[in-house]
Amino acid sequence: MSWPTFWYQTPKQSWKTALLWPVGKLVCWVAARRLKRFKKKGPSKITAAQVVVIGNIVVGGSGKTPFIQWLGRQLSEHGLTFGVVSRGYGGQSKVWPQWVTEHSEPTMVGDEPVLLAQSLHCPVAVSPNRADAIALLESKYDLDVIISDDGLQHYKMARDIEIVMMDSERLLGNEYCLPAGPLRESKRRLGLVDFVVWNGGDASDLASETSTIMKLVPQHFRSVANPKMILPISSFKHEKTNAMAGIGNPQRFFNTLSELGIDADVTPFADHKAFQSSDFDTFESTKPLLMTEKDAVKCRAFAQPNWWYLEVQPLCPATFAHQLFHKLGHYDFTI
């Protein structure tokens, strides 16, 4: 999805901001009232597991999925059991809640839940009401931690820890609430969560006692049709390629390819787009097509042999992991 350019301009640069500002103020006020009501008398917790919400206050991609992958692997490495709940955004199923496996159809349950099931090999449940998804997890598993993919503003779900993801390139935009700007709620919300994680950026500028930096380190390319096939990261340096991305911030992916020395003709698609084979008819079939792992999940059924996705490794500082595990009540975490 392409976001309005005036969201990322100063108010003086766009008359649209001034026109929509009163509506944005109302959205901020309603969001603040909902939060106040939740803090005063929120829903009772239905699980003994620690519920960790990974959300954002800015619309669009911010790196929630790779951070959840990082967190899940940290939990596994330290012997903690976990599951993931999600709304299943973009899923067309009429039956909720439901389980998600690595073989689930993204068009039915959403692309991100399928990707998390494939990459983390953990139980995943989806429902527009995340409390129902948690109950489904609890019906079968005794978990230490439940991770909520998004859901910061989903106040039907009780939680123990709130983590907000932020894009270090787009920041808060013009700092106005929808529709005048990109914020779901006031920037003051950042001061009320447990941690803020910046996707990329300079640690000296963004890191603090309650915030940290996540780096996405390119590892290699995997075949979309056969993920067991791997190519070195340098494979496409001297080759003309196509690249596509249907994520919240496709330019970030295209910039990464450029930094790797890859010359690509790029095509952005809407976030969460349900791809069909006809969407790729305009791409030159003789050129390799590069994409993100999230896109690959939705293209595997009709992928061509020269389609590849970039696998990245999300990394956060060990000091942050120590803080987070301490917050979870696991004081024996060792760096």
Swiss-Prot record:
Catalytic activity of the protein: a lipid A disaccharide + ATP = a lipid IVA + ADP + H(+)
Stored InterPro entries: LpxK, P-loop_NTPase
First-level EC class: transferase
E.C. number(s) listed in UniProt: 2.7.1.130
Binding site for ATP: V58, V59, G60, G61, S62, G63, K64, T65
Gene Ontology molecular function, alphabetical: ATP binding; tetraacyldisaccharide 4'-kinase activity
Keywords on record: ATP-binding, Kinase, Lipid A biosynthesis, Lipid biosynthesis, Lipid metabolism, Nucleotide-binding, Transferase
Pathway entry: Glycolipid biosynthesis; lipid IV(A) biosynthesis; lipid IV(A) from (3R)-3-hydroxytetradecanoyl-[acyl-carrier-protein] and UDP-N-acetyl-alpha-D-glucosamine: step 6/6
An example Gene Ontology biological process: lipid A biosynthetic process
Coiled coil stretches, renumbered: none
Protein origin, superkingdom: Bacteria
Cellular component, GO annotation: plasma membrane
Purpose of the protein: Transfers the gamma-phosphate of ATP to the 4'-position of a tetraacyldisaccharide 1-phosphate intermediate (termed DS-1-P) to form tetraacyldisaccharide 1,4'-bis-phosphate (lipid IVA).
Family to which this protein belongs: Belongs to the LpxK family.
UniProt name for this protein: Tetraacyldisaccharide 4'-kinase
